[in-house]
């Protein structure tokens, strides 16, 4: 089987390794009579032995050079019909009885996708808790009935609550209550009446996934040192780690900054109450520390970290954007990439004249579930040709970041987004770039070599 070698990734790594294109082609057996790195080709098909030669030459892993663009990257979306959704059904049993049916919405391979759950645990049974998971989540009641949410062993207002469905015909596109769930929050659900009920839950990839995966590789000695490090509060830990990285002690930092020791001591402990922002920035500058990482957000939610958003709260949030009515679902500033919205489409058209359509695009991945009506999904493919797709209840879509699209017709959807591949921490890195706009433009399909050919 041929390996698809990504030309831009190859050139990028040649630059990192300080190897000219000419030297690479001269010294490394690519298995090709000619590999024109100046051509418009995006990838080269080579043998397994050839890619082995290249990764050994550049000290890389194969996946670091693999061409990964797929069909959905070009058209910008993945569609899943209701029939395909139903085929993903799998039953979960707990304590000997049917507990949930799970269904999975579409997403690219390797991505996290929202799931729909049929809540099967009857109202008279106390649902058994799970152990929670590292990833945060938003969960929305799809109705038609209410559900019980349980988040702790004791049964009280904090640990046990009804997530209502929306019984108002005028606002039924807002299907029900929703809530944000933090990391490792135990949770479970049961029916809260004789009515059936479903939920839509989006358990998203965490921006710390790679960080945690790498730390699971620590040796015993490394783990001891890491656990010693995290015994300090986060801000103090960040400052202490940066000081040790550059060989600063409390005294030498105070001496370099020409500041009294007690002021520097307060800074190191994260006690900023009596410190001016400019002083904090100056100390960070000495240590080459981005001061923004010291500005910690407030941890929101209740005593368990969860945030429940009622139907009434969603109704109050209604607004118009791009000729579509929107309403908010639960969210948390502690997980800014994870968002949920209810959308009402009421802009009937036969779809023949789309010349003046005000397309929308978003900086994050978007998952859509149609909850009512008949809707026309309109999009642009890679050649700027208009694509149309008819949608009805329980059809679903994944739409790529920056993909132009729109909805026409009468109906409703739920939209969920996360930052997988485009998370908000990128914005901090972009903010650190010199000449940010031109730098990012250059990085897109950068075909320039090291410059010493």
What are these regions (language model features)?
Residues 10, 21, 51, 62, ...:
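Helix-turn-helix DNA-binding elements, focusing on the entry/boundary residues of the two helices
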Residues 29-55, 68-70, 258-275:
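Recognition helix of helix-turn-helix/homeodomain-like DNA-binding domains
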Residues 60-118, 228-229, 242, 277, ...:
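A short, N-terminal "cap"/entry segment at the start of jelly-roll beta-barrel domains
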Residues 118-122, 130-156, 342-349, 358-381:
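Short, conserved beta-strand element in jelly-roll/cupin
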Residues 1-27, 221-248:
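A short, Lys/Arg-rich alpha-helix, primarily the initiator
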Residues 150-185, 376-404:
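Short acidic-glycine-tyrosine-enriched beta hairpin
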Residues 21, 31-34, 62, 250, ...:
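The DNA-contacting recognition helix of HTH DNA-binding domains
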Residues 192-235, 410-453:
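Double-stranded beta-helix
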């Amino acid at each position: 089987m041929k390996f698809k070698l990504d030309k831009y990734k190859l050139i990028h790594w040649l630059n990192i390794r300080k190897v000219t294109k000419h030297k690479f082609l001269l010294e490394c057996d690519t298995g090709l009579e000619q590999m024109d790195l100046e051509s418009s080709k995006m990838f080269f098909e080579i043998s397994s032995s050839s890619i082995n030669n290249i990764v050994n030459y550049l000290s890389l892993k194969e996946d670091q050079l693999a061409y990964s663009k797929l069909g959905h990257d070009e058209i910008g979306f993945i569609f899943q019909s209701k029939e395909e959704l139903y085929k993903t059904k799998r039953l979960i049993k707990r304590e000997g009885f049917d507990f949930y049916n799970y269904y999975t919405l579409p997403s690219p391979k390797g991505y996290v996708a929202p799931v729909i759950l049929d809540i099967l645990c009857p109202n008279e049974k106390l649902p058994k808790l799970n152990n929670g998971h590292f990833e945060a989540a938003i969960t929305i009641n799809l109705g038609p009935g209410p559900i019980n949410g349980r988040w702790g062993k004791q049964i009280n207002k904090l640990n046990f609550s009804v997530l209502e469905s929306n019984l108002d015909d005028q606002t039924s596109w807002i299907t029900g209550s929703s809530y944000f769930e933090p990391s490792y929050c135990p949770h479970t659900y049961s029916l809260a009446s004789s009515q059936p009920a479903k939920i839509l839950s989006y358990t998203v990839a965490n921006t710390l996934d790679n960080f945690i995966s790498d730390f699971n590789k620590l040796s015993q000695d490394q783990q001891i040192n890491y656990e010693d490090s995290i015994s300090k509060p986060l801000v103090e830990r960040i400052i202490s780690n940066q000081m040790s990285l550059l060989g600063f002690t409390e005294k030498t930092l105070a001496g370099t900054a020409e500041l009294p020791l007690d002021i520097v001591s307060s800074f190191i402990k994260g006690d900023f109450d009596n410190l001016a922002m400019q002083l904090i920035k100056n100390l960070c500058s000495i240590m080459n520390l981005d001061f923004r990482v010291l500005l910690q957000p407030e941890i929101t939610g209740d005593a368990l970290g969860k945030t429940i958003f009622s139907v009434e709260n969603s109704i109050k949030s209604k607004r118009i954007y791009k000729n579509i009515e929107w309403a908010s679902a639960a969210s948390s500033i502690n997980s800014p990439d994870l968002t949920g919205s209810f959308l009402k489409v009421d802009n009937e058209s036969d779809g023949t004249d789309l010349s003046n359509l005000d397309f929308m695009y978003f900086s994050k991945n978007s998952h859509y579930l149609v909850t009512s009506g008949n809707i026309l999904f309109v999009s642009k493919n890679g050649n700027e040709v208009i694509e149309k797709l008819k949608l009805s209840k329980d059809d679903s879509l994944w739409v790529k970041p920056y993909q132009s699209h729109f909805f026409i017709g009468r109906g409703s959807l739920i939209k969920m987004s996360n930052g997988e591949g485009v998370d908000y921490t990128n914005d901090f890195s972009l903010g650190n770039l010199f000449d940010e706009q031109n730098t990012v433009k250059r990085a897109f399909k950068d075909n320039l070599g090291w410059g010493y050919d």
